[in-house]
């Protein structure tokens, strides 16, 4: 059961990973158009949106037919909600159907949080991370409300396309969950792209004045009020589990304070015959976590029942700014708060031969090593190809390798992965 014919394949394929990373790649190309006019950049951006749509529609169609063409699968496009613990009502465009099952899986994903800012509702110049990717005209001035990972990805992308980007972040520090040296390197690198950061920014209203938006915000430290004009405003203020219309109460399925479905390590809800997978259960909102959720349920239903959520930690993640930021495990601050005796290793990207050949020398590599065991506790890579290289570190950690395994491993040359030799030396 899927409520939208535009969402087969889920968030990743349609409005998340695939379209954004397609645009990130196109933006990387656009960043080389140094002497181009804004009109030329706008034309390139318009084509990039078309490329994105081609990629997503092809994958959406493939995912739909993988289901619809299977002899054991019936697909309903409609809105589902629980009638009881084992009955789901599906309202299609033409009828209401009741489906009964002893095993039900909830996979409704997450939705964008729209903050209660005056002037945001029904404002045609205000976008979410979903709707802005349908915008075919490159905004000359883009204001992004929120400096988290989603906000930074779009800031980096649109700055590369040629927009003047301002990020309004309510906190005094950028990406507070990262170490300050990593966050400082990210901020400095993005500022080189022309991105402006306004910290301690509390957005009060967004006005639609003629053909432009006027964002009114104050500095939460000083109280001073500012106005910014923009051609588009992006709300990057987080996502929340999509549970509000499911009528979970009648099914005996409980949620936490954030609306996420509560599950055990086998993904069973408070009703053991109903499971929840993906973003709707809270936690890390990554496609590869959803895929591993499937593996857990597969093993629970048809296998040895040994696979569980606690087996997969730590999990790596990447933020596709330019260059990418990737991380796995504990950072330095977290390790020290846990009173771990750690060794900290750092390597500036400018010291990496492959980075020099690419002409991309901004960034920083950092590793956290347990001094007593020699095991890698965590790793942060802000560098070209970081989203690929982090998987090497992840495999070393998951297989229990000593840090010397990466220090002495024979990598190809020149490559970004060989920087691990120097980082762990």
Regions found by a protein language model. Name each.
Residues 1-6, 11-13, 18, 22-23, ...:
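Flexible, glycine-rich terminal cap/loop adjacent to redox cofactors
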Residues 3-138, 166, 171-175, 181-182, ...:
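Glycine-rich flavin
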Residues 122-139, 227-305:
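FAD-site-proximal beta/loop scaffold in flavoenzymes
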Residues 112, 252, 259-273, 326, ...:
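FAD-binding beta-loop-beta segment adjacent to the flavin cofactor pocket
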Residues 74-76, 127, 196-198, 275, ...:
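General small-molecule cofactor/ligand-binding pocket signal
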Residues 94-103, 223-232, 270-271:
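Core beta-strand elements of the Rossmann-like FAD/NAD(P) dinucleotide-binding domain
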Residues 17, 108-168, 193-197, 249-251, ...:
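Glycine-rich dinucleotide-binding loop and its adjacent helix/turn
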């Amino acid at each position: 059961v899927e409520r939208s014919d535009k969402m087969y394949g889920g968030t990743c394929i349609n409005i998340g990973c695939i379209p954004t990373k397609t645009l990130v790649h196109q933006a990387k190309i656009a960043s080389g158009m140094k002497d181009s006019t804004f009109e030329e950049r706008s034309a390139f951006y318009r084509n990039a949106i078309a490329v994105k749509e081609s990629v997503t529609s092809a994958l959406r169609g493939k995912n739909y037919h993988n289901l619809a063409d299977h002899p054991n699968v019936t697909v309903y496009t409609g809105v589902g909600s629980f009638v009881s613990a084992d009955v789901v009502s599906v309202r299609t465009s033409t009828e209401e159907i009741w489906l009964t099952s002893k095993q039900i899986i909830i996979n409704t994903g997450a939705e964008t949080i729209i903050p209660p800012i005056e002037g945001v509702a029904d404002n045609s110049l205000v976008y979410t991370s979903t709707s802005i990717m349908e915008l075919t005209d490159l905004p000359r001035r883009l204001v992004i409300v929120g400096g988290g990972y989603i906000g930074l990805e779009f800031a980096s992308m649109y700055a590369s396309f040629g927009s003047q980007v301002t990020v309004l972040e309510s906190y005094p520090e950028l990406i507070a969950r990262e170490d300050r040296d990593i966050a400082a390197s990210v901020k400095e690198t993005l500022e080189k792209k022309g991105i402006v950061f306004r910290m301690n920014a509390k957005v009060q209203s967004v006005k639609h004045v003629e053909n432009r938006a006027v964002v009114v915000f104050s500095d939460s430290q000083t109280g001073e009020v500012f106005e910014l004009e923009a051609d588009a405003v992006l709300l990057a203020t987080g996502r929340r589990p999509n549970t509000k219309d499911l009528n979970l109460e009648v099914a005996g399925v409980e949620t936490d304070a954030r609306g996420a479905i509560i599950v055990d390590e086998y993904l069973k809800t408070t009703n053991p015959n109903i499971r929840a997978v993906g973003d709707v259960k809270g936690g890390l909102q990554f496609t590869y976590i959803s895929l591993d959720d499937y593996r857990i349920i597969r093993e629970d239903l048809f296998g040895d029942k040994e696979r569980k959520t606690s087996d997969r930690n730590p999990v790596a993640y990447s933020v596709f700014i330019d260059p990418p930021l990737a991380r796995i495990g504990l950072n330095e601050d977290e390790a020290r708060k846990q009173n771990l005796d750690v060794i900290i290793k750092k390597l500036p990207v400018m010291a990496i031969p492959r980075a020099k050949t690419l002409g991309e020398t901004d960034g920083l590599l950092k590793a956290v090593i347990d001094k007593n065991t020699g095991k890698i506790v965590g790793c942060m890579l802000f560098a070209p190809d970081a989203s690929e290289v982090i998987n090497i570190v992840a495999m070393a950690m998951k297989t229990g390798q000593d840090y010397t395994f990466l220090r002495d491993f024979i990598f190809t040359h020149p490559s970004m992965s060989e920087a691990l030799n120097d980082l762990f030396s």
